[in-house]
A protein has these predicted regions:
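N-terminal secretion-targeting helices of virulence/extracellular proteins
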Residues: 1-171
Length: 171
């Protein structure tokens, strides 16, 4: 379910799964690089090539680790989004039953003429419903922050690995 409040859990999950699939493919290639490096070490005389392969392995390890961490974070985020979206749907039912509207994650009174009784009903229900909406907004914010942190850490780790790789290739 896609909505303007929480986002699209399906797309997040799909991207997370794709990143984790790429990790598996990279790790399969890693075995080939390890075998080549070991053969060259045994045969001797190719120290520069072995050093380059070792550097490539370190880069590959970093990329695979960060892809897997990012994919895992996105899939966790997708699960959280789906749960929050369902909670928002249930909250919306309660809000409507109280004669109110949910605008994003704000519980508001709709426009129109109303009776004193309905106004009092809305006035009594609104604070509790807004607290529920606020808890959902807080949960959504925490999930977004946790996911963004993993992505930022991954970006920094990949940038450092790329710099180290470029430095090695310039020697």
């Amino acid at each position: 379910m896609i909505d303007g409040v929480t986002g699209d859990p399906g797309s997040c999950s799909q991207l997370g799964g794709a990143l984790r699939s790429h990790t598996v493919r990279l790790l399969a290639l890693r075995e080939e690089l390890v075998d080549r490096a070991e053969r060259l070490r045994r045969d001797g005389g190719a120290d520069d090539v072995v050093a380059d392969l070792d550097a490539s392995l370190r880069l590959l390890d970093t990329v695979a680790e960060r892809l897997d961490a990012s994919g895992t974070a996105l899939q966790r985020f997708a699960q959280e989004l789906a749960e929050i979206a369902e909670s928002v749907r249930r909250l919306n039912e309660l809000v409507r039953a109280a004669g109110l509207e949910l605008n994003g994650l704000r519980v508001v009174e709709p426009w129109g003429v109303l009776t004193t009784e309905l106004a009092q009903q809305r006035h009594r229900a609104q604070p509790d419903l807004q607290r529920r909406a606020d808890r959902l907004a807080s949960r959504l914010g925490r999930a977004r922050i946790a996911t963004a942190r993993v992505m930022a850490d991954g970006t920094a780790a990949l940038a450092a690995a790329a710099t180290a790789s470029r430095t090695r290739s310039l020697r």
